[in-house]
Structures are given as structure tokens and as C-alpha cells.
Amino acid sequence: MKKYLFIVLLVGVWSCEENKIIKQNEDEDNVVVLDTIRFTQLTNLFRNQCYQCHSEEGFSFYGLNLDSYENIMVGSENGPVVIPFKPHESLLYVKCTPEFIENSSLITGGDRMPKENESFFDNNPEKLQLIYDWIMGGCLE
């Protein structure tokens, strides 16, 4: 009986690990384990904060549409907006961070996003973390 209980527990633990991404940090000797974030987990955030200026239905500033995975991966007139596994080099993340105003010349000019509610991510850091985790996890569809 103990043997079967052990096997059931082992299978349970193993199946939970499928929802994790393990990424070796190239600069350090540590391993980062992230929950798997998929684009569908970001659609409500983008719809509520970004679509009015960055969608095919609304307006498309700089040719950036955040209304589909394919459009995000295409990027904008300024080039890519996400670089998988590199949130600090991805405009989609960087332009939403509080540090963007201080370091905007490092990547691009312009305003912090969302433009109509620049403090949104200050008040909702878990939403910014979701974008970070999605990019760090490889921008999964």
C-alpha cells in the first residue's frame, strides 16, 4: 500500500511541475523558477489599459497593436516590443516601469505607459509582474 501511495504522490508532484519554467540565469549561478504565463492571461490587462491606443479597433499609435499575440510579436514601427526572456530590454515592460522616466533615453523616448493612467502599475505591481513573468518565461502564446 505504501508503494502505491508513494507512486501517486510522485505523479502528483511531477504533474504540478509542468506549469513551471526553469531558466538558468546566464549572469549568475542561480536558477529562476517561474509559473508558466501565457498571453491569454494578459488579454484583460491589455484590453482595459492599452486597447484605446494600441489596437485594431481603437487606434494604433506607432503601429503597435496589443490585441493579439501575433500583433505583439510583430512589434511596432519602432521595432520589437518584446524580446523573449529579456524583460528589461522589452519596451512593453520597460515603458510601464516607474524607472522608465529616469532611464527613458536608454531605450526610447516617449511617455510612460499607460499614458492616460501612468500610476496604474505603481498601484497594481502584480500586473507589471505578470508582464515581466510572461516575457521572462519566453512570451508563450
List the predicted regions and their residue ranges.
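Sec-dependent N-terminal signal peptides
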Residues: 4-12
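Aromatic- and Gly/Pro-enriched helix-to-coil junctions and flexible linker segments
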Residues: 16-141
